[in-house]
């Protein structure tokens, strides 16, 4: 006779597992205002792009960020023969007297400026917020792209115009280039800071033929005193006069090259920022600088609005803003020793304003405050010396 053994229920039925509880996302308890505060502290456009892909909520909040920093990893330019020939053909038809001077005096910076122009191209594409901010570690562009991006070595590069396209409420924008446009020799100091509206408002240039770092022994001794002793040739004993050798050994010519080069670099940056300024009408401040600290272009809210309202005077042949006729003031010291022991050889400070500027000529506070330390101190020391006035025609 067969014996039937009753089948027992599975253990899961005898001891059922407790229902799984959903993990709590604590970010859901944070109000949007707090998250936006965090995103504004982050600032970096590529990091914000990565935040976009975390959640739908983050994706919807990132476009509302008002403080954005674009750090450019590389500047890509087409160096093949076809690109070079096309550049030559375009520039050849518009070559004029200034073009000849430009090539003669500052030919060394033509190629970097062309690369900057290609980097800040105005092509547009319909990409998402997440894609535009995080799909590449390099933000760059060549001149002949379609859609504001280019592939190089399997990496997609984007233009700032494309990257910033989906940010709706930017108030403070900072773009940092990987290096300055002006190729200078090792040991040479060249810094500039320019402000623009629809054209140049002012520019300050600080240069030195060489920089001698502080001697530790002299610095320690200086800390024990309450006075700063200027190096020979930098004090008031010579009344700040420029020595005759400055005119005969090429010193003046070199300063002219520094000035023209800096103005061209500044006006090229300004010209290439137009698409971003036109699109982002909420901007209160725009800064275009470089990681070398060589040049800084600044625009405040009034200056940004002026550019939108007034037509831009542009030099289309060289892709830059037309520089107006200028009044310049120059200060020079053969040797300038700073309080920290740094010595500047051939220290030169140039303050530039348009000839038609209605601002008070005697006010030079904007000159001495143009740079960060230790160069702010250098500027303050130089403006106490004899002033030399120069003029420059529009170019």
Swiss-Prot record:
Domain F-box residues, every copy: 24-72
InterPro entries associated with the record: AUF1-like, F-box-like_dom_sf, F-box_dom
Pfam families noted in UniProt: F-box-like
Region (Disordered): 122-158
Compositional bias of kind Low complexity: 125-142
GO biological process: heat acclimation
Protein name: F-box protein At5g46170
Organism: Arabidopsis thaliana (Mouse-ear cress)
């Amino acid at each position: 006779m067969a014996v039937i053994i009753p089948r027992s229920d599975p253990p899961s039925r005898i001891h059922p597992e407790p229902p799984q509880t959903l993990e709590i996302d604590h970010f859901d308890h944070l109000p949007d205002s707090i998250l936006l505060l965090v995103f504004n502290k982050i600032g970096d456009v590529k990091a914000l792009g990565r935040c976009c892909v975390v959640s739908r909520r983050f994706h919807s909040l990132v476009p509302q960020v008002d403080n954005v920093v674009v750090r450019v990893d590389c500047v890509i330019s087409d160096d093949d023969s076809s690109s070079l020939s096309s550049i030559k053909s375009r520039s050849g038809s518009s070559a004029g007297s200034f073009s000849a001077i430009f090539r003669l005096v500052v030919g060394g910076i033509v190629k970097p400026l062309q690369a900057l122009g290609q980097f800040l191209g105005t092509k547009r594409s319909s990409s998402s917020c997440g894609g535009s901010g995080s799909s590449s570690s390099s933000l760059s562009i060549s001149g002949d792209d379609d859609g504001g991006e280019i592939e190089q070595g399997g990496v997609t590069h984007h233009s700032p115009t494309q990257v910033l396209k989906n940010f709706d409420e930017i108030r403070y924008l900072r773009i940092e280039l990987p290096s300055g446009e002006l190729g200078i020799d090792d040991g040479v100091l060249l810094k500039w800071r320019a402000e623009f509206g629809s054209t140049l408002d002012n520019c300050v240039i600080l240069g030195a033929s060489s920089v001698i770092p502080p001697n530790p022994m002299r610095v320690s001794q200086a800390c024990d005193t309450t006075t700063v002793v200027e190096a020979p040739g930098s004090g008031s004993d010579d009344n700040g006069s420029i020595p005759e050798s400055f005119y005969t050994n090429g010193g003046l010519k070199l300063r002219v090259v520094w000035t023209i080069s800096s103005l061209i670099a500044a006006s090229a940056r300004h010209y290439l920022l137009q698409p971003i300024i036109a699109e982002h009408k909420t901007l209160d401040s725009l800064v275009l600088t470089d990681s070398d600290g060589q040049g800084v272009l600044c625009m405040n809210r009034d200056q940004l609005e002026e550019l939108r309202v007034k037509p831009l005077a542009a030099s289309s042949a060289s892709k830059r803003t037309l520089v107006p006729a200028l009044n310049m003031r120059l200060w020079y010291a053969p040797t300038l020793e700073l309080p920290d022991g740094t010595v500047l050889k051939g220290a030169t400070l140039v303050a530039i304003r348009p000839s038609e500027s209605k601002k008070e000529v005697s006010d030079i506070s904007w000159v001495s405050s143009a740079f960060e330390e230790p160069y702010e101190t250098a500027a303050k020391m130089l403006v106490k010396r004899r002033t030399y006035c120069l003029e420059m025609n529009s170019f």
